[in-house]
Amino acid sequence: MNNSLLQVRDLSKAFGNVVTAKNLNFSLARGVLTSIIGPNGAGKSTLINILTGFIPPDSGEIIFQGKDITREPIDRRVRLGLCRSFQVANVFGHLSLFENIAIPVLAVERKAKSFLRSVAKDGEVRKEVDKILDRVGLLSQSHVPASALSHGDRRLLEVGIALAARPRLLFLDEPTAGMNPVERTRILQNIRDLSAHGEVTFVIVEHDMDVVFSLSERVIVLYRGHVIGDGTPEQVKGNPQVREVYLGEEVT
Amino acid sequence: MKSNWKYIIVALMLLVLIGIGYFSSRFVLYLAMKIMILSIFAMGYNILFGRTGLLSFGHAAFYATGAYGVALCSMHVHTHPLVGIMVGIAAAAFLALIIGFFCVRHTEIYFAMLTLAFGMMVFSLMWNLRDITGGDDGLSGIMRGSVSLGFLKISITKDSQFYFLVLFFFALSMLLVHRIYQSPFGLVLAGIRENHVRTEFAGLGVKRYRLAAFVVSGAFAGLAGALGLLLESNVTPFAAHWSHSANPVLVSLMGGLQTFSGPIVGSIVFVLLREFIERFTHNWMLWFGVILLAIILGFRGGIVGSTTQLVKRLSKVS
């Protein structure tokens, strides 16, 4: 139990008659790269939205590092170490890449409130920002505005912003959607490295089964708000219920 | 190179302003003071509008609070202008904190309408509390006491003396706003304008930063109102009227929302245009409207924004 980072207890959410989460119970262990999969409308995005504070659940509890965060606002969850990236690149369009990364860095270093010091002259912040830009391969474009980036680069930046918040647990919503093979390799390599380091525990929502099965140590299958499969990729592949509702359609 | 140019321009501007203070007629002094006071109002306002992306229609309330603050302070407490100005700023900031607390829960049109509603409430309070504010007559005949700093006593009774106090606060405001724009706080505000969801997911409480921007801009409005009162020596409730709230909006739009110097350039154009047009016609609003239309349609990013882009393009060609 010591190794558990996030626990979900009896989590439910319904939009009118549409049940997107029904008595969900699971826990995520530190350092175990987990994927959440499921057919369209299975409740994957809603689950992430609830866990990160975007939507309140109807009932249930979310425990993060032993602390009940069910009612905590988004920004406090992020400061506690729970962050996410978005399906659609969600960046600061008119700000430079440096500034894009600097905002979460300032938040982490608790410098965001200072209003008389210069950001550009803060060596510590610059070093940290450059480190992250280098990690996602965008260091050379640090002065370019984010709106001028290609779609794939914007996705890389998006992941960079999420990493800059120094999360313990990071949800990536379709991290490789719309990327070219080079960018995809880079981002997957980053995820593997960081995960192996043990700094960040990743939870990935993906449609691409190659990514899911090559990367994950654990796969959770959602279907209509229920968990219908949970285990190693092999176990999930072998699960008859999963094959029936989901894998049978896409993976042969 | 680029930043050197900026310092040269600022130094030149300050030199010109000092020159005006020593050598100009009273009329030019008066116009220059009006421009500087409007600049302080608009620069502070633009922290909220251009930087944070929140359009407020209620900032005249804070301007008026600053003005009434000085007037009441010098009538009942102390005539020291610096004490009065501090009281004015503090009162405006405090009012901004209360009003902002409710307004920052919303954005865009809802935010704008809320600020408008609060602004009108402040206006009618000032109109109706006759015993304190003098009702529709306002407060008039406020004298400028001397600025006494220990041994030193500086008289500001004459406009040519008061001018340098205005210039001092104008320069101080420029410095402060510039520092805010370079600071982490300023960057966070820009982040909120660009993408408030992402800012929240960067671990920052967006509402609190919006409120902080609201209070800071309210404090600058209070400073402008305080100086405006000392300049005119009277204030009426119309200082809080919503039509007065439009001034910093127009000024920021004309000069350039996303620029530091936009509100200053906008203020110069605004005050001079008005002065110029009013000599020929009483319907200055009509002609001003036409000119404003031309500036907004013709200069994308305001006068400063479009000029900078032009200079960049030209320097690339050559």
Where do the protein language model's features map onto the residues?
Chain A
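Glycine-rich phosphate-binding loops of nucleotide-dependent enzymes
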Residues: 2-252
